[in-house]
């Protein structure tokens, strides 16, 4: 898991490939 941040930050700019997570609030960490 990742660990969800206390506040939802703006989703990162969309690159050539889809985001590793929906919404953009939780960073992809294990």
Swiss-Prot record:
Purpose: Strong antimicrobial activity against P.immobilis and M.luteus, less active against E.coli D22.
This protein's name: Antibacterial 6.5 kDa protein
Keywords (A to Z) from UniProt: Antibiotic, Antimicrobial
Family indicated by similarity: To bovine bactenecin 7.
Residue ranges of the region described as Disordered: 1-30
Extra information: On the 2D-gel the determined MW is: 6.5 kDa.
Compositionally biased region (Pro residues): 1-21
């Amino acid at each position: 898991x990742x660990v969800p941040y206390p506040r939802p930050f703006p989703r990162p700019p969309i690159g050539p490939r889809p985001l590793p997570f929906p919404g953009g609030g939780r960073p992809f960490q294990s």
